[in-house]
Amino acid sequence: MKISEIPAFAGRQAWTEIRGYYKLLLMTELIYKEESYKIIGAAMEVHKDLGAGFLESVYQEAFELELQKQEIPYEREALLNIFYKGQKLKKRYSADFVCYDKIVVELKALGELNSDPEAQILNYLKTTGLKLGLLINFGSRSLQYKRLVL
């Protein structure tokens, strides 16, 4: 296959040839890279000290203390408005944290992550217009986190 025969994709990209096969390399930049690294670093600090096995509420309290210590701006239990056809609904979402006024952070204490919390964060992003959500799981032996971008 010639490089000219490979279909085009949206976004910045590059193709590399490996043993006669072409592989697409997406050249994406992380949004809010520095801010998200700081938030994940704060979560790692909490997990390093507490480990796994506590309730989600314990991790939320410890994470809030770590955000304060590292001077990361946040709002806890941030109420997120929901709109339907331009009208604000009475029902609102409550995100665990919104950091830097632009990153939704949802904490979990699950043995393994499943797709439910991901869908929850994507709904938060859709309703607020924010672009980045971080799903952080303290319940496993190693800290787990996912970046969700809308």
Question: Can you say where each PLM-predicted feature lies in the sequence?
Answer:
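A short acidic/basic microdomain associated with nuclease active sites
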Residues: 68-85
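Interdomain/boundary linker segments immediately adjacent to catalytic/signaling cores
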Residues: 17-50
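Extreme N-terminal basic, low-complexity initiation segments
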Residues: 1-8
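Short Gly/Ser/Thr- and charged-rich N-terminal loops/segments
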Residues: 8-15, 21
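A short, glycine/Asx- and small/polar-enriched loop/turn
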Residues: 88-93
